[in-house]
Amino acid sequence: MLLATSGRLDGFKVTKYLGIVTGEAIMGTNFIRDLLASISDIIGGRSGAYEQQLEEARNIVLNEMSERAKRLGANAVIGISLDYESVGQSMLMVVATGTAVYIEPEM
């Protein structure tokens, strides 16, 4: 399954547009991770714990979106958009949206 943020894939033509597909994940953070992130905020630097959680959530939503596209008969998803939101004080929501398509190599 090819995934792209652009609406076009070089060397391929879209032969079928199969619809909008999404993937969603809401991840809870935990007390220890919040504490470590607070320390990073105070002393400066990056929060590895939150970065790892963001990466995990992003992988979940892209895989979920790909599976939904496959069920529609797609072999690619184009125009992908990722959105990150905080929900409450300790939840992270990640949403991926794209267009499921069937592509073929250009001749």
From Swiss-Prot:
Pfam entry (one): YbjQ_1
Q: Which InterPro entries match?
A: UPF0145_dom_sf (IPR035439), UPF0145_YbjQ-like (IPR002765)
Coiled-coil regions listed: none
Hey, what's the signal peptide range on this chain? none
Gene3D superfamilies named among the record's database cross-references: Hypothetical protein apc22750. Chain B (3.30.110.70)
What does the sequence similarity comment in the record state about its family?
Answer: Belongs to the UPF0145 family.
State the protein's name.
Answer: UPF0145 protein CHY_0465
